[in-house]
Amino acid sequence: VDFNVPIKEGKVKNTTRIQGAIPTLKKILEQNPKNVTLMSHMGRPDGKRVEKDSLKIVVPKLEELLGTKVNFVNDCVGSEALEASNAGNGQINLLENLRFHIQEEGKGLDANGAKIKADKESVKKFRKELSSLGDIYVNDAFGTAHRAHSSMVGIDHKIRVAGYLMKKELDYFAKALETPQRPFLVILGGAKVADKIQLIKSMLDKVDEMIIGGGMAFTFLKKYIMFPIGKSLFDEEGYKIVDEIIAKAKEKNVKIHLPTDFVCGTGLDASSPVALHDLKSGIPDGWLGLDAGQLTQRENADAIGRAKTIVWNGPQGAFEIEQFKNGSVSMLNALVKQTQNGATTIVGGGDTVNLVGANKANDKLSH
């Protein structure tokens, strides 16, 4: 399941993802299973235990929505998890955050913040332990289904099925992507080009226009026009494939939109000073682009206003911080307006879904 929900002041802020899993869970419980064990991510603890990312906080809301008790297990592997998986009477177990183990993603950070990788043998052992916790694998975590994580690709069961939420999401996306109303616009954000290379390539075969914003835009700007990006996010791996993406966009006659002005700060926190920079000035050393400026916001709104089908994956900036949220919020407002004008608007990706929920716009978009 995908219980990677936004938390504020020790409480679940938005229950959409938990609610989404309930139909599948209720259907499973109707079959009188010996027990049900739930796995999920929470936050980005980078392969180590971080208490603020514990899934324990989800239990009260899950119990309320299911109308039954949920047993929280303090680790996703080990003796406690194995013991819980052998319980009877239809017991529901929620395992602790999979991402507390480096073997889930295959990489993480050590205590000093240095990048580390999990060795193959430990990943193999981790996957075997997860597999031992059940007989049938149900994937209802659409938001993480694209990731090659152990819980997604490493569960060794003969019976592996999609849950109701997964099916609903896939059916909706298939219809929208196979027979879209045109013009068709895709909006991409997030940090790394390399993480979304397959998505970018496949969308270039389908769309008429593409907005590239957020952190990944700086990799494009540095490569494409040698723009000075200061200490903005830069994806070295993605840098190598920018030319290929731009060439394919030209071949397919897809118009690419990149930001033209930026709200910048010296750090990713609320105490950071704020400065405005554009393509002429560049971003100075020591500063990083953290949001789209007003000109970019207007250009994005114009592109959204032309589109009849819009897919949005990735915010335009560090929207969690007050002074860097306007680019993402203005984009959301433009999508809400275009939905009212009859466009089909689809939002995906954890951060973007959280942004929509935080601005109480879940029911103002198509999906």
Swiss-Prot record:
GO terms for biological process: gluconeogenesis; glycolytic process. Its cofactor is Mg(2+). GO terms for cellular component: cytosol. (2R)-3-phosphoglycerate binds at V1, D2, F3, N4, R17, S40, H41, G43, R44, L98, R99, H146, R147. AMP binds at A191, K192, K196, G215, G289, E320. Mg(2+) binds at A191, A194, D195, D351. ATP binds at A191, K196, G215, G289, E320, D351, T352. Pfam families: PGK. Keywords: ATP-binding, Glycolysis, Kinase, Magnesium, Metal-binding, Nucleotide-binding, Transferase. Pathway: Carbohydrate degradation; glycolysis; pyruvate from D-glyceraldehyde 3-phosphate: step 2/5. CDP binds at G190, D195, G214, G314, F319. It comes from the Eukaryota. Its EC number is 2.7.2.3. ADP binds at G190, G214, F319. It catalyses: (2R)-3-phosphoglycerate + ATP = (2R)-3-phospho-glyceroyl phosphate + ADP. GO terms for molecular function: ADP binding; ATP binding; metal ion binding; phosphoglycerate kinase activity. Monomer. Belongs to the phosphoglycerate kinase family. This is Phosphoglycerate kinase. The lineage of its organism: Eukaryota, Sar, Alveolata, Ciliophora, Intramacronucleata. The gene is PGK.
